[in-house]
Amino acid sequence: MFERTSKPAFVENICVESMRCPKSAVTMRNEELLFSNGTTNKMNGALDHSDQPDPDAIKMFVGQIPRSWSEKELKDLFEPYGAVYQINVLRDRSQNPPQSKGCCFVTFYTRKAALEAQNALHNIKTLPGMHHPIQMKPADSEKSNAVEDRKLFIGMVSKKCNENDIRVMFSPFGQIEECRILRGPDGLSRGCAFVTFSTRAMAQNAIKAMHQSQTMEGCSSPIVVKFADTQKDKEQRRLQQQLAQQMQQLNTATWGNLTGLGGLTPQYLALLQQATTPSNLGAFSGIQQMAGMNALQLQNLATLAAAAAAAQTSATTTNVNPLSTTASALGALTSPVAASTANSSAGAAMNSLTSLGTLQGLAGATVGLNNINALAGTVNIAQMLSGMAALNGGLGATGLTNGTAGTMDALTQAYSGIQQYAAAALPTLYSQSLLQQQSAAGSQKEGPEGANLFIYHLPQEFGDQDILQMFMPFGNVISAKVFIDKQTNLSKCFGFVSYDNPVSAQAAIQAMNGFQIGMKRLKVQLKRSKNDSKPY
Protein backbone atom coordinates (compact mmCIF):
# COMPACT_ATOMS: atom_id res chain seq x y z
CA MET A 1 0.00 0.00 0.00
CA PHE A 2 1.04 3.57 -0.67
CA GLU A 3 1.40 5.99 2.17
CA ARG A 4 -0.89 9.06 2.07
CA THR A 5 0.64 12.32 3.20
CA SER A 6 -0.17 16.00 2.81
CA LYS A 7 2.33 16.25 -0.04
CA PRO A 8 -0.09 15.34 -2.86
CA ALA A 9 -2.41 18.18 -1.88
CA PHE A 10 0.55 20.57 -1.86
CA VAL A 11 1.72 19.42 -5.29
CA GLU A 12 -1.82 19.65 -6.64
CA ASN A 13 -2.16 23.26 -5.46
CA ILE A 14 1.15 24.14 -7.12
CA CYS A 15 -0.05 22.58 -10.38
CA VAL A 16 -3.36 24.42 -10.27
CA GLU A 17 -1.63 27.77 -9.84
CA SER A 18 1.12 27.22 -12.41
CA MET A 19 -1.11 25.64 -15.06
CA ARG A 20 -3.87 28.23 -14.74
CA CYS A 21 -6.60 25.62 -14.95
CA PRO A 22 -9.46 24.55 -12.64
CA LYS A 23 -8.45 22.50 -9.66
CA SER A 24 -10.84 19.78 -10.78
CA ALA A 25 -8.84 19.40 -13.98
CA VAL A 26 -5.60 18.48 -12.22
CA THR A 27 -5.03 15.10 -10.69
CA MET A 28 -2.18 12.68 -10.35
CA ARG A 29 -2.15 9.02 -9.83
CA ASN A 30 -0.81 8.45 -6.33
CA GLU A 31 0.95 5.26 -7.29
CA GLU A 32 2.98 7.19 -9.84
CA LEU A 33 3.43 10.28 -7.70
CA LEU A 34 4.66 8.76 -4.45
CA PHE A 35 6.77 5.91 -3.34
CA SER A 36 6.01 4.30 -0.02
CA ASN A 37 8.61 6.52 1.60
CA GLY A 38 6.88 9.70 0.39
CA THR A 39 9.50 10.75 -2.18
CA THR A 40 8.41 12.24 -5.49
CA ASN A 41 8.81 10.19 -8.64
CA LYS A 42 10.44 12.40 -11.31
CA MET A 43 9.77 9.74 -13.96
CA ASN A 44 13.12 10.29 -15.57
CA GLY A 45 14.69 6.94 -14.90
CA ALA A 46 18.14 8.57 -14.83
CA LEU A 47 20.62 9.21 -12.06
CA ASP A 48 22.75 11.92 -13.66
CA HIS A 49 20.27 14.73 -12.94
CA SER A 50 19.68 16.69 -9.80
CA ASP A 51 16.29 16.76 -8.09
CA GLN A 52 15.26 19.92 -9.97
CA PRO A 53 15.25 20.70 -13.71
CA ASP A 54 17.51 23.37 -15.17
CA PRO A 55 16.53 26.98 -14.35
CA ASP A 56 15.56 27.65 -17.99
CA ALA A 57 13.55 24.43 -18.38
CA ILE A 58 10.13 24.79 -20.04
CA LYS A 59 6.84 23.26 -18.98
CA MET A 60 5.09 22.20 -22.19
CA PHE A 61 1.38 21.74 -22.79
CA VAL A 62 0.59 18.72 -24.98
CA GLY A 63 -2.79 18.19 -26.64
CA GLN A 64 -4.30 15.59 -28.96
CA ILE A 65 -3.21 12.55 -26.95
CA PRO A 66 -5.40 9.44 -26.55
CA ARG A 67 -7.66 9.56 -23.50
CA SER A 68 -6.67 5.99 -22.69
CA TRP A 69 -2.97 6.81 -22.33
CA SER A 70 -1.41 6.90 -18.88
CA GLU A 71 1.70 8.70 -17.65
CA LYS A 72 3.82 5.63 -18.42
CA GLU A 73 2.87 5.62 -22.10
CA LEU A 74 3.46 9.36 -22.32
CA LYS A 75 6.84 8.92 -20.69
CA ASP A 76 7.79 6.43 -23.40
CA LEU A 77 6.71 8.99 -25.99
CA PHE A 78 8.76 11.90 -24.60
CA GLU A 79 11.93 10.25 -23.23
CA PRO A 80 13.61 9.77 -26.64
CA TYR A 81 14.07 13.56 -26.70
CA GLY A 82 15.48 13.91 -23.19
CA ALA A 83 15.03 13.01 -19.54
CA VAL A 84 11.53 13.81 -18.25
CA TYR A 85 11.14 15.54 -14.90
CA GLN A 86 7.37 15.41 -14.55
CA ILE A 87 4.18 14.50 -16.45
CA ASN A 88 0.73 15.66 -15.34
CA VAL A 89 -2.30 14.29 -17.17
CA LEU A 90 -5.36 16.54 -16.95
CA ARG A 91 -8.40 14.52 -15.84
CA ASP A 92 -12.09 15.21 -15.48
CA ARG A 93 -12.86 14.54 -11.83
CA SER A 94 -16.59 14.84 -12.36
CA GLN A 95 -16.48 11.31 -13.73
CA ASN A 96 -15.92 8.20 -11.65
CA PRO A 97 -13.22 7.12 -12.07
CA PRO A 98 -11.68 10.39 -13.36
CA GLN A 99 -11.11 10.27 -17.13
CA SER A 100 -8.27 11.85 -19.09
CA LYS A 101 -9.12 15.02 -21.00
CA GLY A 102 -6.73 14.11 -23.78
CA CYS A 103 -4.01 16.57 -22.78
CA CYS A 104 -1.15 16.85 -20.32
CA PHE A 105 1.77 18.94 -19.09
CA VAL A 106 5.32 17.66 -19.45
CA THR A 107 8.48 19.15 -17.99
CA PHE A 108 11.91 18.05 -19.22
CA TYR A 109 15.07 18.52 -17.23
CA THR A 110 16.55 20.68 -19.98
CA ARG A 111 15.16 23.37 -22.24
CA LYS A 112 16.88 21.79 -25.22
CA ALA A 113 15.00 18.51 -24.75
CA ALA A 114 11.66 20.33 -24.63
CA LEU A 115 12.37 22.24 -27.84
CA GLU A 116 13.56 19.11 -29.62
CA ALA A 117 10.38 17.30 -28.60
CA GLN A 118 8.29 20.22 -29.84
CA ASN A 119 10.10 20.33 -33.20
CA ALA A 120 9.63 16.59 -33.66
CA LEU A 121 6.02 16.27 -32.50
CA HIS A 122 4.08 19.52 -32.87
CA ASN A 123 1.73 19.34 -35.87
CA ILE A 124 3.78 16.39 -37.16
CA LYS A 125 3.10 13.16 -35.27
CA THR A 126 -0.45 11.81 -34.98
CA LEU A 127 -0.97 9.29 -32.19
CA PRO A 128 -3.04 6.10 -32.63
CA GLY A 129 -6.79 6.72 -32.65
CA MET A 130 -6.44 10.50 -33.08
CA HIS A 131 -7.58 12.52 -36.10
CA HIS A 132 -5.22 15.46 -35.61
CA PRO A 133 -1.47 15.71 -34.91
CA ILE A 134 -0.02 16.44 -31.49
CA GLN A 135 -0.21 20.05 -30.32
CA MET A 136 2.80 20.94 -28.18
CA LYS A 137 3.61 24.44 -26.95
CA PRO A 138 4.88 26.18 -23.82
CA ALA A 139 2.34 26.34 -21.01
CA ASP A 140 0.79 29.68 -20.07
CA SER A 141 3.14 29.96 -17.11
CA GLU A 142 6.08 30.01 -19.56
CA LYS A 143 4.79 32.91 -21.64
CA SER A 144 7.04 35.39 -19.84
CA ASN A 145 9.93 33.94 -21.85
CA ALA A 146 7.97 32.55 -24.77
CA VAL A 147 9.76 31.34 -27.89
CA GLU A 148 7.90 33.89 -30.01
CA ASP A 149 9.62 36.68 -28.05
CA ARG A 150 13.07 35.33 -28.94
CA LYS A 151 12.54 34.01 -32.45
CA LEU A 152 13.98 35.96 -35.40
CA PHE A 153 13.08 35.92 -39.05
CA ILE A 154 16.08 36.24 -41.37
CA GLY A 155 15.28 37.32 -44.92
CA MET A 156 17.40 37.87 -48.02
CA VAL A 157 19.64 34.92 -47.15
CA SER A 158 21.82 33.42 -49.86
CA LYS A 159 20.31 30.18 -51.10
CA LYS A 160 23.76 28.63 -50.86
CA CYS A 161 23.78 28.96 -47.04
CA ASN A 162 22.88 26.06 -44.78
CA GLU A 163 21.95 25.93 -41.08
CA ASN A 164 25.58 25.85 -39.95
CA ASP A 165 26.37 29.01 -41.92
CA ILE A 166 23.48 30.81 -40.24
CA ARG A 167 24.57 29.60 -36.80
CA VAL A 168 28.10 30.87 -37.37
CA MET A 169 26.72 34.22 -38.50
CA PHE A 170 24.49 34.74 -35.43
CA SER A 171 26.32 32.85 -32.65
CA PRO A 172 28.33 35.96 -31.59
CA PHE A 173 25.11 37.43 -30.16
CA GLY A 174 24.28 34.59 -27.78
CA GLN A 175 23.22 30.98 -27.39
CA ILE A 176 21.12 29.75 -30.30
CA GLU A 177 18.44 27.23 -29.39
CA GLU A 178 17.13 26.62 -32.87
CA CYS A 179 18.20 27.45 -36.40
CA ARG A 180 16.10 26.44 -39.37
CA ILE A 181 16.21 27.38 -43.05
CA LEU A 182 12.86 27.49 -44.77
CA ARG A 183 12.82 25.06 -47.68
CA GLY A 184 10.38 24.28 -50.45
CA PRO A 185 8.94 20.87 -51.36
CA ASP A 186 12.00 20.25 -53.52
CA GLY A 187 14.28 20.70 -50.50
CA LEU A 188 15.87 23.87 -51.85
CA SER A 189 16.30 26.96 -49.69
CA ARG A 190 13.73 29.72 -50.07
CA GLY A 191 16.25 32.34 -49.04
CA CYS A 192 15.03 32.85 -45.48
CA ALA A 193 15.55 31.30 -42.04
CA PHE A 194 14.40 31.33 -38.41
CA VAL A 195 16.80 31.68 -35.48
CA THR A 196 15.73 31.32 -31.83
CA PHE A 197 17.96 32.71 -29.08
CA SER A 198 17.90 31.83 -25.37
CA THR A 199 16.83 35.33 -24.35
CA ARG A 200 15.06 38.25 -25.96
CA ALA A 201 18.02 40.53 -25.25
CA MET A 202 20.24 38.35 -27.43
CA ALA A 203 17.70 38.53 -30.24
CA GLN A 204 17.49 42.32 -29.96
CA ASN A 205 21.29 42.63 -30.14
CA ALA A 206 21.30 40.48 -33.27
CA ILE A 207 18.69 42.73 -34.90
CA LYS A 208 20.66 45.89 -34.10
CA ALA A 209 23.91 44.50 -35.48
CA MET A 210 22.75 42.46 -38.48
CA HIS A 211 19.67 44.12 -39.98
CA GLN A 212 20.53 45.71 -43.36
CA SER A 213 24.22 45.15 -42.58
CA GLN A 214 25.19 43.25 -45.75
CA THR A 215 23.92 41.99 -49.07
CA MET A 216 24.46 38.27 -49.45
CA GLU A 217 25.34 36.46 -52.65
CA GLY A 218 22.45 36.15 -55.08
CA CYS A 219 20.24 38.62 -53.18
CA SER A 220 18.90 41.90 -54.55
CA SER A 221 18.54 43.62 -51.15
CA PRO A 222 20.40 43.71 -47.81
CA ILE A 223 19.73 41.05 -45.21
CA VAL A 224 16.52 41.46 -43.19
CA VAL A 225 16.60 40.60 -39.48
CA LYS A 226 13.44 41.09 -37.39
CA PHE A 227 11.28 39.32 -34.83
CA ALA A 228 9.26 36.55 -36.41
CA ASP A 229 5.53 37.09 -36.67
CA THR A 230 3.57 35.74 -33.73
CA GLN A 231 0.23 34.01 -34.06
CA LYS A 232 -1.40 37.24 -32.91
CA ASP A 233 0.40 39.16 -35.66
CA LYS A 234 -0.77 36.67 -38.27
CA GLU A 235 -4.38 36.90 -37.11
CA GLN A 236 -4.19 40.69 -37.07
CA ARG A 237 -2.78 40.74 -40.61
CA ARG A 238 -5.53 38.40 -41.77
CA LEU A 239 -8.17 40.70 -40.26
CA GLN A 240 -6.54 43.70 -41.92
CA GLN A 241 -6.62 41.94 -45.28
CA GLN A 242 -10.29 41.11 -44.81
CA LEU A 243 -11.02 44.72 -43.87
CA ALA A 244 -9.10 45.97 -46.92
CA GLN A 245 -11.11 43.66 -49.18
CA GLN A 246 -14.36 44.87 -47.65
CA MET A 247 -13.32 48.50 -48.11
CA GLN A 248 -12.41 47.79 -51.74
CA GLN A 249 -15.79 46.17 -52.28
CA LEU A 250 -17.46 49.13 -50.57
CA ASN A 251 -15.60 51.59 -52.79
CA THR A 252 -16.48 49.56 -55.88
CA ALA A 253 -20.13 49.47 -54.84
CA THR A 254 -20.09 53.20 -54.11
CA TRP A 255 -18.74 54.14 -57.51
CA GLY A 256 -21.00 51.59 -59.11
CA ASN A 257 -23.97 53.39 -57.59
CA LEU A 258 -22.61 56.81 -58.53
CA THR A 259 -22.05 55.90 -62.18
CA GLY A 260 -25.68 55.22 -62.98
CA LEU A 261 -25.60 57.87 -65.72
CA GLY A 262 -23.74 55.53 -68.06
CA GLY A 263 -22.63 57.48 -71.10
CA LEU A 264 -23.37 60.83 -69.47
CA THR A 265 -20.74 60.34 -66.77
CA PRO A 266 -17.83 61.98 -68.70
CA GLN A 267 -19.84 65.18 -69.13
CA TYR A 268 -20.44 65.43 -65.41
CA LEU A 269 -16.80 64.73 -64.67
CA ALA A 270 -15.96 67.57 -67.03
CA LEU A 271 -18.30 69.76 -64.98
CA LEU A 272 -16.38 68.90 -61.82
CA GLN A 273 -13.02 69.52 -63.46
CA GLN A 274 -14.08 72.93 -64.70
CA ALA A 275 -15.51 73.80 -61.31
CA THR A 276 -12.08 73.42 -59.74
CA THR A 277 -10.25 75.78 -62.11
CA PRO A 278 -9.40 79.29 -60.77
CA SER A 279 -11.20 80.95 -63.69
CA ASN A 280 -14.51 79.48 -62.57
CA LEU A 281 -14.29 80.35 -58.89
CA GLY A 282 -15.89 83.73 -59.52
CA ALA A 283 -18.93 82.08 -61.02
CA PHE A 284 -20.12 80.89 -57.63
CA SER A 285 -20.34 84.41 -56.19
CA GLY A 286 -23.05 85.37 -58.69
CA ILE A 287 -25.40 82.54 -57.76
CA GLN A 288 -25.73 83.10 -54.02
CA GLN A 289 -29.26 84.36 -54.73
CA MET A 290 -30.12 80.76 -55.60
CA ALA A 291 -29.44 79.57 -52.07
CA GLY A 292 -33.16 79.44 -51.38
CA MET A 293 -33.74 76.76 -53.99
CA ASN A 294 -35.16 73.47 -52.79
CA ALA A 295 -33.49 70.15 -53.50
CA LEU A 296 -35.52 69.60 -56.68
CA GLN A 297 -34.19 72.84 -58.17
CA LEU A 298 -30.70 72.02 -57.01
CA GLN A 299 -31.12 68.64 -58.64
CA ASN A 300 -31.47 70.25 -62.06
CA LEU A 301 -28.85 72.98 -61.65
CA ALA A 302 -26.24 71.05 -63.59
CA THR A 303 -28.67 70.73 -66.50
CA LEU A 304 -29.11 74.51 -66.55
CA ALA A 305 -25.36 74.98 -66.70
CA ALA A 306 -25.18 72.63 -69.66
CA ALA A 307 -28.10 74.43 -71.32
CA ALA A 308 -26.36 77.78 -70.91
CA ALA A 309 -23.22 76.41 -72.51
CA ALA A 310 -25.20 74.96 -75.40
CA ALA A 311 -26.93 78.29 -75.91
CA GLN A 312 -23.64 80.17 -75.94
CA THR A 313 -22.16 77.79 -78.50
CA SER A 314 -25.23 78.16 -80.70
CA ALA A 315 -25.08 81.96 -80.47
CA THR A 316 -21.50 82.14 -81.76
CA THR A 317 -22.46 80.34 -84.97
CA THR A 318 -26.05 81.46 -85.67
CA ASN A 319 -26.11 84.89 -83.98
CA VAL A 320 -29.09 83.88 -81.81
CA ASN A 321 -29.65 85.29 -78.30
CA PRO A 322 -28.15 82.70 -75.89
CA LEU A 323 -30.83 83.14 -73.26
CA SER A 324 -33.66 82.81 -75.72
CA THR A 325 -32.08 79.61 -76.97
CA THR A 326 -31.84 78.37 -73.41
CA ALA A 327 -35.47 79.24 -72.78
CA SER A 328 -36.56 77.40 -75.90
CA ALA A 329 -34.48 74.41 -74.92
CA LEU A 330 -36.08 74.32 -71.50
CA GLY A 331 -39.43 74.80 -73.12
CA ALA A 332 -38.89 71.45 -74.77
CA LEU A 333 -38.85 70.02 -71.30
CA THR A 334 -42.11 71.66 -70.26
CA SER A 335 -44.20 71.05 -73.36
CA PRO A 336 -44.23 67.25 -73.09
CA VAL A 337 -45.27 67.58 -69.48
CA ALA A 338 -48.30 69.61 -70.47
CA ALA A 339 -49.20 66.96 -72.99
CA SER A 340 -48.83 64.24 -70.39
CA THR A 341 -52.14 65.24 -68.84
CA ALA A 342 -53.77 63.02 -71.43
CA ASN A 343 -55.55 59.96 -70.11
CA SER A 344 -53.36 57.55 -72.07
CA SER A 345 -50.62 56.03 -69.92
CA ALA A 346 -48.70 55.11 -73.08
CA GLY A 347 -48.76 58.73 -74.15
CA ALA A 348 -47.47 59.79 -70.75
CA ALA A 349 -44.62 57.32 -71.05
CA MET A 350 -43.66 58.62 -74.50
CA ASN A 351 -43.79 62.21 -73.28
CA SER A 352 -41.54 61.30 -70.36
CA LEU A 353 -39.07 59.71 -72.73
CA THR A 354 -39.09 62.81 -74.93
CA SER A 355 -38.39 64.97 -71.89
CA LEU A 356 -35.57 62.69 -70.85
CA GLY A 357 -34.04 62.86 -74.32
CA THR A 358 -34.06 66.64 -74.16
CA LEU A 359 -32.55 66.53 -70.67
CA GLN A 360 -29.75 64.23 -71.80
CA GLY A 361 -29.10 66.32 -74.88
CA LEU A 362 -28.69 69.44 -72.78
CA ALA A 363 -26.48 67.71 -70.25
CA GLY A 364 -24.32 66.27 -73.01
CA ALA A 365 -23.23 69.72 -74.16
CA THR A 366 -19.89 71.23 -73.11
CA VAL A 367 -20.34 72.72 -69.66
CA GLY A 368 -19.48 76.34 -68.92
CA LEU A 369 -20.03 77.42 -65.35
CA ASN A 370 -19.35 81.07 -66.09
CA ASN A 371 -22.67 81.21 -68.00
CA ILE A 372 -24.56 80.65 -64.76
CA ASN A 373 -23.96 84.29 -63.75
CA ALA A 374 -25.73 85.62 -66.84
CA LEU A 375 -28.45 83.02 -66.47
CA ALA A 376 -29.01 83.95 -62.83
CA GLY A 377 -29.10 87.68 -63.49
CA THR A 378 -31.43 87.68 -66.50
CA VAL A 379 -33.87 84.79 -66.23
CA ASN A 380 -36.13 83.79 -63.35
CA ILE A 381 -34.59 80.51 -62.24
CA ALA A 382 -37.76 79.34 -60.54
CA GLN A 383 -39.75 79.75 -63.77
CA MET A 384 -37.17 77.90 -65.83
CA LEU A 385 -37.19 75.03 -63.37
CA SER A 386 -40.96 74.85 -63.14
CA GLY A 387 -41.16 72.68 -66.22
CA MET A 388 -38.77 70.17 -64.72
CA ALA A 389 -40.68 70.25 -61.45
CA ALA A 390 -43.83 69.54 -63.43
CA LEU A 391 -42.04 66.57 -64.93
CA ASN A 392 -41.62 65.22 -61.43
CA GLY A 393 -45.27 65.71 -60.63
CA GLY A 394 -46.46 64.36 -63.96
CA LEU A 395 -44.79 61.07 -63.21
CA GLY A 396 -46.43 60.74 -59.81
CA ALA A 397 -49.49 58.63 -60.51
CA THR A 398 -49.19 57.94 -64.24
CA GLY A 399 -45.50 57.57 -65.01
CA LEU A 400 -44.79 55.16 -62.17
CA THR A 401 -47.47 52.69 -63.26
CA ASN A 402 -48.86 51.07 -66.38
CA GLY A 403 -45.63 49.66 -67.79
CA THR A 404 -43.18 52.58 -67.69
CA ALA A 405 -40.40 50.76 -65.83
CA GLY A 406 -37.86 51.41 -68.59
CA THR A 407 -38.63 55.10 -68.56
CA MET A 408 -38.23 55.25 -64.80
CA ASP A 409 -34.85 53.51 -64.94
CA ALA A 410 -33.53 56.13 -67.35
CA LEU A 411 -35.02 58.99 -65.34
CA THR A 412 -33.59 57.53 -62.16
CA GLN A 413 -30.10 57.48 -63.65
CA ALA A 414 -30.34 61.02 -64.96
CA TYR A 415 -31.76 62.51 -61.77
CA SER A 416 -29.45 60.69 -59.37
CA GLY A 417 -26.36 61.52 -61.41
CA ILE A 418 -27.20 65.21 -61.84
CA GLN A 419 -28.02 65.55 -58.16
CA GLN A 420 -24.77 64.02 -56.94
CA TYR A 421 -22.46 65.81 -59.35
CA ALA A 422 -24.22 69.14 -58.84
CA ALA A 423 -23.78 68.66 -55.11
CA ALA A 424 -20.07 68.06 -55.55
CA ALA A 425 -19.60 71.00 -57.92
CA LEU A 426 -21.63 73.49 -55.88
CA PRO A 427 -20.79 72.80 -52.23
CA THR A 428 -22.12 76.14 -50.95
CA LEU A 429 -25.61 75.61 -52.28
CA TYR A 430 -25.62 71.97 -51.28
CA SER A 431 -24.61 72.73 -47.70
CA GLN A 432 -27.39 75.31 -47.46
CA SER A 433 -29.85 72.78 -48.82
CA LEU A 434 -28.57 70.36 -46.19
CA LEU A 435 -29.31 72.87 -43.44
CA GLN A 436 -32.83 73.34 -44.78
CA GLN A 437 -33.45 69.60 -44.51
CA GLN A 438 -32.04 69.05 -41.02
CA SER A 439 -35.54 69.30 -39.59
CA ALA A 440 -36.46 66.18 -41.56
CA ALA A 441 -34.27 64.00 -39.31
CA GLY A 442 -36.39 62.18 -36.76
CA SER A 443 -39.74 63.24 -38.19
CA GLN A 444 -42.27 60.79 -39.61
CA LYS A 445 -44.01 63.02 -42.13
CA GLU A 446 -45.08 61.07 -45.20
CA GLY A 447 -44.66 62.16 -48.79
CA PRO A 448 -46.96 61.54 -51.75
CA GLU A 449 -47.82 58.05 -52.98
CA GLY A 450 -44.71 56.24 -54.21
CA ALA A 451 -42.29 58.61 -52.45
CA ASN A 452 -41.94 56.76 -49.12
CA LEU A 453 -39.17 54.22 -48.58
CA PHE A 454 -38.64 51.39 -46.09
CA ILE A 455 -34.94 50.64 -45.40
CA TYR A 456 -33.82 47.32 -43.86
CA HIS A 457 -30.43 46.14 -42.56
CA LEU A 458 -29.17 49.49 -41.32
CA PRO A 459 -26.02 49.35 -39.15
CA GLN A 460 -27.04 49.46 -35.51
CA GLU A 461 -25.00 52.61 -34.87
CA PHE A 462 -26.92 54.58 -37.54
CA GLY A 463 -29.20 57.36 -36.31
CA ASP A 464 -31.68 59.75 -37.90
CA GLN A 465 -28.96 62.13 -39.10
CA ASP A 466 -26.99 59.30 -40.70
CA ILE A 467 -29.91 57.97 -42.72
CA LEU A 468 -30.85 61.53 -43.72
CA GLN A 469 -27.38 62.29 -45.08
CA MET A 470 -27.28 58.93 -46.86
CA PHE A 471 -30.50 59.53 -48.80
CA MET A 472 -30.33 63.30 -49.35
CA PRO A 473 -28.34 63.09 -52.62
CA PHE A 474 -31.38 61.67 -54.42
CA GLY A 475 -33.89 64.41 -53.71
CA ASN A 476 -35.69 66.55 -51.15
CA VAL A 477 -36.10 64.45 -47.98
CA ILE A 478 -39.09 65.54 -45.91
CA SER A 479 -38.63 62.94 -43.16
CA ALA A 480 -36.03 60.38 -42.08
CA LYS A 481 -36.50 58.12 -39.07
CA VAL A 482 -34.58 55.16 -37.60
CA PHE A 483 -36.72 53.07 -35.27
CA ILE A 484 -35.44 52.57 -31.72
CA ASP A 485 -36.27 49.75 -29.31
CA LYS A 486 -37.87 51.43 -26.30
CA GLN A 487 -36.65 48.69 -23.96
CA THR A 488 -32.96 48.71 -24.94
CA ASN A 489 -32.78 52.18 -26.51
CA LEU A 490 -30.92 50.54 -29.43
CA SER A 491 -31.68 50.75 -33.12
CA LYS A 492 -33.95 48.11 -34.62
CA CYS A 493 -31.83 48.38 -37.79
CA PHE A 494 -34.65 49.62 -40.03
CA GLY A 495 -36.18 52.98 -40.81
CA PHE A 496 -38.24 55.14 -43.15
CA VAL A 497 -37.32 57.93 -45.58
CA SER A 498 -39.89 60.09 -47.38
CA TYR A 499 -39.30 62.36 -50.38
CA ASP A 500 -41.56 65.03 -51.83
CA ASN A 501 -41.73 63.22 -55.20
CA PRO A 502 -41.71 59.62 -56.46
CA VAL A 503 -38.81 60.13 -58.87
CA SER A 504 -36.38 60.76 -56.02
CA ALA A 505 -37.63 57.64 -54.25
CA GLN A 506 -36.99 55.53 -57.36
CA ALA A 507 -33.53 57.08 -57.72
CA ALA A 508 -32.74 56.12 -54.12
CA ILE A 509 -33.96 52.55 -54.67
CA GLN A 510 -31.86 52.14 -57.81
CA ALA A 511 -28.71 53.47 -56.15
CA MET A 512 -28.99 52.18 -52.57
CA ASN A 513 -30.79 48.83 -52.74
CA GLY A 514 -28.08 46.23 -52.18
CA PHE A 515 -25.54 48.88 -51.17
CA GLN A 516 -23.05 47.29 -48.75
CA ILE A 517 -22.15 49.04 -45.48
CA GLY A 518 -19.68 47.02 -43.45
CA MET A 519 -20.98 43.45 -43.38
CA LYS A 520 -24.57 44.38 -44.28
CA ARG A 521 -26.34 45.08 -47.57
CA LEU A 522 -29.15 47.61 -47.45
CA LYS A 523 -32.61 46.59 -48.63
CA VAL A 524 -34.50 49.63 -49.92
CA GLN A 525 -38.07 49.37 -51.16
CA LEU A 526 -41.25 51.41 -51.39
CA LYS A 527 -43.24 51.58 -48.18
CA ARG A 528 -46.57 49.81 -48.40
CA SER A 529 -49.58 52.06 -48.66
CA LYS A 530 -51.96 52.06 -45.72
CA ASN A 531 -54.73 51.20 -48.15
CA ASP A 532 -52.99 47.97 -49.24
CA SER A 533 -54.19 46.14 -46.14
CA LYS A 534 -57.82 47.24 -46.58
CA PRO A 535 -60.01 44.80 -48.56
CA TYR A 536 -62.38 47.55 -49.71
Curated annotation (Swiss-Prot):
Which residues does the UniProt record annotate as the domain RRM?
A: 58-141, 150-230, 451-529
| Listed Gene3D superfamilies | 3.30.70.330
Q: Which GO terms describe its biological process?
A: mRNA splice site recognition; regulation of alternative mRNA splicing, via spliceosome
Q: Which SMART domains does its entry note?
A: RRM
- Family annotation (InterPro entries): CELF1/2_RRM1 (IPR034196), CELF1/2_RRM2 (IPR034198), CELF1/2_RRM3 (IPR034199), Nucleotide-bd_a/b_plait_sf (IPR012677), RBD_domain_sf (IPR035979), RRM_dom (IPR000504)
UniProtKB keywords: Cytoplasm, mRNA processing, Nucleus, Repeat, Repressor, RNA-binding
One of the record's GO molecular function terms: mRNA 3'-UTR binding
Where in or outside the cell it occurs: the entry states: Nucleus; Cytoplasm
Pfam families registered for this protein in UniProt: RRM_1 (PF00076)
User: A GO CC term?
Assistant: ribonucleoprotein complex
Q: What does this protein do?
A: RNA-binding protein implicated in the regulation of several post-transcriptional events. May be involved in pre-mRNA alternative splicing, mRNA translation repression and stability.
Family to which the UniProt record says this protein belongs: Belongs to the CELF/BRUNOL family.
Q: What is this protein called?
A: CUGBP Elav-like family member 2
Q: Identify the species of origin.
A: Xenopus laevis
